[in-house]
Regions:
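Ligand-binding cleft/hinge of the Venus flytrap
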Residues: 38-44, 118-166, 173-180
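Sec/Tat signal peptide C-region and signal peptidase I cleavage site
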Residues: 15-19
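Short amphipathic alpha-helical "recognition" segments used for binding
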Residues: 7, 104, 175-178
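N-terminal segment of the mature folded domain
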Residues: 20-133, 138-139
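Sec-dependent N-terminal signal peptides
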Residues: 4-13
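Glutamine-centric residue-chemistry signal
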Residues: 62, 171-174
Length: 183
């Protein structure tokens, strides 16, 4: 994925490369990948990337209001396509990677990972789950997908009062890492 992402940024930034740097609005989920490839991009091109991380929905709003980003790396295609439809983008929206929704658990969690969320449902009933962190479904695509998955598993009503909402995936991850949420 890193090579694909590096190539995507390289070709996307060709129009702004004369400036010596490109300003990138990137979904928080891309922090580790972009932190790794940014120095490689600079070494290969002589140009730097100035990366801001956050939720895709907030970046959409900022760009709509005139924020000077050269590249928008969203966690989904919805927000970039809106910018294209509103004639606020200079290029078509293109997918650059495919993400996966996961249930993040601390190493010593009493919850058991499973693809059906059956243990999460059991944890709701037996009291093992008091706080569940998700990204804000209004502005973060992974938050939206988490809400959809919980609704599909008929767990949304049960987890809703236990939610700890992060502004983006990075913040939701920090809630779990710090112990503020069990999952």
């Amino acid at each position: 994925m890193l090579k694909i992402l590096a190539c995507f940024i390289w070709f996307t930034c060709l129009g702004t490369a004369h400036a010596g740097s490109a300003t990138v609005a990137a979904a928080a989920t891309l922090r580790h990948a972009l932190d790794e490839i940014s120095p490689q991009f600079t070494k290969a091109t002589g140009h730097t990337l100035k990366v801001a991380y956050g939720s895709s929905g907030n970046f959409y709003s900022q760009i709509k209001q005139g924020a000077p980003f050269d590249v928008f790396l969203s966690a989904d295609m919805v927000f970039p396509q809106k910018l294209v439809d509103e004639k606020l983008a200079v290029a078509p929206a293109l997918p650059y990677a495919e993400g996966r929704l996961v249930l993040l658990l601390p190493r010593k969690s009493r919850l058991k990972p499973d693809g059906t969320l059956a243990d999460l449902a059991a944890a709701l009933k037996d009291g093992r789950l008091s706080k569940l962190a998700i990204a804000n479904p209004t502005v973060a695509p992974y938050g939206t997908r988490a809400q959809e998955a919980l609704m599909h598993a008929d767990l949304w009503a049960g987890v809703k009062p236990r939610l700890v909402i992060g502004e983006n995936v990075g913040q939701a991850t920090q809630f779990v890492a710090s112990g503020a949420a069990q999952a």
